[in-house]
């Protein structure tokens, strides 16, 4: 596992937060810095067909070292970190041989506690890499980036049989844009794995169907003293809309395969208001029903408004559940599960309550389930990753490459 930790710490030192609402891809300059660094490292490692597109997709190939009809496979991670929490001046803490209890995050009152995060009880004796309480860590997905780079180094430096290994690093995954500019044909893999999951053993091939709902409300503002029969309060209409959304179908009240409506932002005045929801559901029919529900709510609340006042609703699908594409190729999951078992890991098949680049890529002709990275609590100050989990991810990547070669020989 030469340089795994060193690589990871170097990558998280670069601020690569993506930014929503920006037309350009990548959305931030910091992502270019990491992409150029990775390009240089791939060149130094001796990979071939290295390309960095104008949209920030970095691709490279580790050529096969054995003969045979071996399918080319790929591994993909994203370089951006979430815009939900600061990713600037990340200052990781390394906690060796974790013995339980609270971990102080920097100087202050912030702690990483097993009371709030019981998974810590399962990680006794391991090396934890945490934040200092002021930023996110960036293990999502720089752990995946470091693991792929380290796996390439292992395959390059050891006589482990493998076919062509394609790797790609994408931008703007956190804002849903990176995979839209991914050239599947140029990539040249028959299938791939994103390395963007969580705890050791996770293997994910189901994700939410996802849509965004943007609501614009135009009211009418007059002096409150003479408002009767004239004022139309856009904020009151917004409140009525949200009151119609099922309260027990929110992110904080759902789990597993349950879908939800999530009010992500709301702002406005009496005259004008805006609301932004996201809709998520694993079941396609329920997903479509949720979209219809939002339209029905808007019509109900907007009924009878003055013609100059209105509610405008725009729904846009973001991505779909990749299950329907991945299950057509069961060997992809079989190989990953066998690789985990060979590395003394129990595979844990679970749905992604979110999305990955792999969801979009699967519908673009590249079946692409998701492998674990060893990280936890993404997108916030309690994010952490275990060194042992990262090492296991490297072992699984290498073993997948080896098993694929054996099937083709």
From Swiss-Prot:
Recorded superkingdom: Bacteria
Entry's EC annotation: 3.4.11.4
Assigned keywords, A-Z: Aminopeptidase, Cytoplasm, Hydrolase, Metal-binding, Metalloprotease, Protease, Zinc
Pfam families hit by this protein: M20_dimer (PF07687), Peptidase_M20 (PF01546)
Localization of this protein: Cytoplasm
Major site of localization recorded for this protein: cytoplasm
Catalytic activity: Release of the N-terminal residue from a tripeptide
CDD domains xrefs: M20_peptT (cd03892)
Active site residues according to the UniProt entry: 80, 173 (proton acceptor)
GO BP term, pick one: proteolysis
Co-factor binding details: Binds 2 Zn(2+) ions per subunit.
Protein name per its UniProtKB record: Peptidase T
Gene: pepT
